[in-house]
Amino acid sequence: MSKIKNLLFTIVSVFLCSFNAWGQNGVSTIIGKIVDVVNEPIIGAQCVLLNHPDSTQITGTTTNVDGVFELKASKDKEYILHISFIGFETYTSNIALNESIDMGKITLSPKAYTLDDVVITAQMVDRFSDKKEYKLTNAEKEQYSSALSALEFLPKIQVIDQSVSSVDGKGIKILINGVPSTATDLSIISPSNIAKIDYYTQPPVQYSNMGLGAVINVVTKTNENGGIIGLNTQNAITTGFGNNTVNFKYNFGNSQVGVTYNVNYRNYNKRILDESLQYFIDDEEYRKEKTGKESPYAYEEQMAEISFNNAKADNYVFSSKLSLKSLNRRRSSVQDIMMYSAEETTQLIGESSDKDKYIRPVLDMYFNKSFNKKHEITLNAVGTYYDSDYKYNYRELLGDITDFETATDISTDKYSFIGDAMYSLNLKSSQLFVGTRYMYNNNRQKNIAGPNSIETNEVYSYVGATGMIGQNVNYNVSVGVNHNVFATLDNERYSFTYFRPQLSVGYFIDETSDVMLNYEVNTQTPSISNLTYNPYYKDPHYVYVGNPDLKPGNIHNVSLSYYKGFKKFVINPEIGYSYANDAIVPIFIRSNNNITETFGNIDYVQNMTASLFLQWYPFDNNLLRLRLFADVYHQINKYGEMQWEHTGYSIIPSIMMSYKKWGLQLYYQTQKETLSGQMLKVSPSMAYAELSYRPLKNMTITAGIRYPFYDAWKLTTETHGTNLISRVETERIINNANMVYLNFVYNFSFGKNKPNVKLKMSNEDKDAGILGR
């Protein structure tokens, strides 16, 4: 009994001391927890304290991942507490704040919608100086099979084959609770575990110079003393095609351990490679027409990862990942060749095979420390090693006689280090930051031509600020310096320094619309693959090589966008312009009586773009979503006395329907032409239809068909802007046409939810060091 009395006395003492602390300095605190009718916490509810009786706002906040809020205001005054969240009735209460108050649980009742009351994206977004924060309702989360597919809730984001990109084709950087992550990691997280999504349409300064279209940070509910098991499989039943992931994570105290395995594979037997080739050497024409036959193509890409995280909210975060990734790819082709000359026409048989494989271990260490909620230090170190091999053989046969033969055999040892450090100071309405990134690469190769070695060093240092000016203007400004040093096997060293400013200014017109102006200067750094010579012949007088004399290019980008969210409709037009000085692009030159395909620094590349994104929910309860993205672009290239241009466009309509446990998605993308230097790539059009069903909570089964009514998947590359050579290569994979597949997603979690913490950086080396064919 005495122990019970002591325990009660301790509890009462702590309770009274807490109230005493709340009441200090003339300020009292209001706390509470917002839940729905089934007692689930409501995350991101708006909690505002208004002055009584004029209703001027005193302070405000949003509920955390546990639905808890905390407001502080002067005591001995009367206020109005106003709580709101999309899909629920607004809660108001008059409060006489004489002392600190615990409101306990506040239950919000669902709102009875009429058609005109449905408000979608516009009012589900909190806007900050550098991002937009999206919160999905439970009904919206049920429309998606995984956290990865839920990213399609965001404007201009598309998810295909367990990968995510912007609709204009740019890459997306994925963070999970700020931790550098991948689409694979998201594919095994249940959408019900999403607390919010931070959407950076203009990548923060630490992610600049990566060619990204956006950065997305998915904040989840984590588990305390429990774990998560996730499975996401996508496999075709008509051909060899699969993307499969399994994951297990276990939480104990402030720590988490995880294991992930991912395997993607392709196994086709109907790949066809056609080619048309023509060039002149000493006024003699070399012309060939190659008609491909059905040939095999296969690869297996595997990744195993173990991870450990230890974090204490508002204090520190430590994260480490050790992963091993491997690739084994094989492809071959057989072609009927017609070779034309002034004297005769010769029929040949062409045979090619290429094999490439690599093993890539990566160690990623991350640490973030906060001091007094104002100061933050972030450190990130990534070490990568590549052991890769590439073998290519090609020959043309005249009967049993080899008329032409070429081969390349490259073995590469490459290791790299990326180190990042950043300090930030959080002020009332702004954040100041300073940081530096160091990147080191050492690439050693053995090939038929002999050994090769390249070493690169790059340092990028920056300082900047982000914040708000008043209630309507947000800004993000930084200045940086990029310094590059290259060293070759012959001890030749090249050094380059560039100034890199970045400015983003936005104006919030009203609660549902804004306009954004972005300007930045980036450095286009040549990759190890571009710098390595590695010659091989594609024809007797046509050779393909890297360029050790490349220097970095400088790219100026400016864009202006407008966003408007009506009750059921979103419109987002954007115009952009870029100017790349000394741009690194594929070019063709004449050298040593050969036509050489390589990479070069041309005078400039100008790109002009205009795009329009539309989204419409025409019916109640978001039953149907219609989307349309369209863009048009024009490019001008200048290289010496030559100038060439190209204009292209793309249109992407999509339809998504959701009714109870069923879902239907239809997608189409027109053919798209992309010009890079003197090579034009014609990406194929794409279409798919998917029907999904959720038999159990956190389980989704999807049946789909890819490229319906197509005869093949087709990719074409051709020369453009040069009179030295004319070459058109068309790759077709018949196996992909009318491909039927099944997708099974299941997530099981156990444990109690608690808030998460954020990381700020991500680094990765994806360059294997081999010049692609």
Language-model segment annotations:
Residues 494, 511-513, 523-572, 579, ...:
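Outer-membrane beta-barrel signature, preferentially recognizing the C-terminal barrel domain
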Residues 209-216, 223-273, 299-302:
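Outer-membrane beta-barrel translocator/receptor signature
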Residues 72, 153-155, 179-206:
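Short acidic/polar hinge/loop motifs at secondary-structure boundaries
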Residues 35, 46-50, 84-88, 102-140, ...:
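Short, acidic, small-residue-rich periplasmic hinge/interaction motif at the N-terminus
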Residues 148-181:
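Extracytoplasmic beta-strand/coil segments of soluble accessory domains associated
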Residues 53-68:
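Short, acidic Ser/Thr/Gly-rich low-complexity loop/linker segments typical of extracellular
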